[in-house]
Amino acid sequence: MLRHVLCAIACAATLAAPPAAAAEPAPLPLFDAHLHYNWEPVPHFTLEQVLALFRAQNVTGILATSRPNDGTRALYEAKPKDLWVVPFIRPYRVRPDIQTWMSDPQTEELIATEFKRGYYQGIGEFHLSGRAAEAPQVKKTVDFAVRHDLYLHAHADDEALEILFRHNPKAKIVWAHTGFFTAPEQVAAYLERYPALWCELSYRGGITAGGRLTDEWRRLFERYPDRFLLGSDTWVNERWDSYGRTMAEYRGWLAQLPRTVAEQIAWRNAERLFRR
């Protein structure tokens, strides 16, 4: 399916391309801060296919994770000229690890072994709900991240998020999905309370209504323009098939914000956080 999507994009561009003098400016560059290039289960898309898709969508950078970490390594080690890859260690080998990583004695070794490669900038995405975040293995993971100046990419509910910061107040957390449906006023409270918290917006509900930014989220973005990131969350192949639509939806509401705010959320925040 992805191959057909890419072919359609290429054909449409060829047939509809205006003369060079009348060419429209490139769409706003985007950094995808929630990208999974999973190699389990198969099938998976080729490296060439996904790189072509990023290029077609003017996605110029990604926060890359995978299950297992082979996919992330493939993206990073390819060193594509037109894509900045920020690799994170995922504490999963197979999908069932989502439920058990926080109690699996092999998690610590998995993280430490991957970290020795020398290029990872964070750990995650990992899943936590409620008091499961109190597990000793979770605290070890948080402390490892702080000790090595790594970010944590946490798919966590409100309670688990607070526990992560209690484990170590020096933690730097990218909050996957921004709680899904956590009220905007509570999101604002967390941003005030935790200066090293950044909110990633894949699957986040309530941002728009009828294609228009809601007042609550407009205020939040304009008040904290340096604290938000975009993401696709390509956790299943269907998310790859709808990748272009996801990016178009982001650009749709970003266009309703002041240009400086839109650019911060689109890519400048990632540049500030992750560029080495």
Annotate each predicted stretch with a short phrase.
Residues 24, 70-151, 198, 203-206:
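Active-site gating/metal-coordination segments in enzymes
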Residues 38-45, 62-73, 94-104, 129-135, ...:
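Acidic-and-aromatic substrate-binding clefts and catalytic sites of carbohydrate-active enzymes
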Residues 34, 54, 123, 145, ...:
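Conserved, mostly hydrophobic/aromatic
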Residues 29-33, 60-66, 86-90, 121-125, ...:
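Structural recognition of the beta-strand scaffold that forms the well-ordered cores
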Residues 85, 132-230:
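Catalytic pocket-lining loop regions of alpha/beta-barrel enzymes
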Residues 2-4, 23-31, 41-43, 48-66, ...:
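Mid-to-C-terminal alpha-helical segments outside catalytic/metal-binding sites
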Residues 5-17:
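Bacterial N-terminal signal peptides
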